[in-house]
Amino acid sequence: METALFVFAHPDDVADGMGGMASLLKDKFDLHLVCATKGERGLPGRSPDETAAIREKEEERECGLLGGKLDFLGRIDAELIVDAETCRRAAEIVRRTNPAAVFTLWPVDNHPDHEAVSEIARRAVLMAGSPAEIVYLEAGEDQTELFTPSVYLDISEVMDRKLELVRCHECQNPDDRLAQHSLRKATRRGKEIGCAYAEGYRPLPASDSDTPSIFSALSQTRMPVE
């Protein structure tokens, strides 16, 4: 099978941002997750090493549910920058996996790690000489800026699965807050296209014009309502 590659900043970014997409792709593509950091600063009161160990296990649990492979780039939460070594590591994974599509976060975001990983993913595709389609997705409701979906995915049939992925990240989900955030976001996007739950995306065309979009493999793809 072809590979879908997800390049993101923190554990839980995939589950919250594209858990529906990942659930729909898992039986059609080999999934490969690349996490730049281990979210070391995501638990106030815990040391970075302790937090990293907790969040790594949670990300491995999510990846197991998706039947995917997981790599970490070894960078530090809240210190992610677009440097040559990180881009080189990411590019090597792109070369090795030869993905049909690379999913990453939208580059305009008030979290510096999100902006950095977006550029790292873009440069990795270029450095690898890959024809992969780059697909941008949104992060949290109060983080991503200037994002208007150009294509939607109806995830109504897998919303429960998405929430299961989100709930793998127990340390980020006190009182089910992260799951409820994901539910609100999917409900809002669903209303925009007339379904129960949806995710929004902005794909860039593959450099090879003959390469079909990954969305062509998904019957749940929807276009914006005029």
Model-based region annotation:
Residues 41-69:
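Glycine-rich phosphate-binding loop and adjoining beta1-alpha1-beta2 segment
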Residues 23, 60, 119-122:
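Active-site phosphate/pyrophosphate- and oxyanion-stabilizing loops and adjacent acidic/basic residues
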Residues 36, 63-78:
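A conserved beta-strand->alpha-helix junction
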Residues 1-7, 46, 69, 76, ...:
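Metal-dependent de-N-acetylase/amidase catalytic core
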Residues 16-17, 54, 85:
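Short, conserved clusters of charged catalytic residues that mark active-site
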Residues 2-49:
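ATP-dependent adenylation/pyrophosphate-handling site
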Residues 27-30, 66-68, 130:
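Short glycine/proline-enriched coil/turn segments at helix->beta-strand junctions
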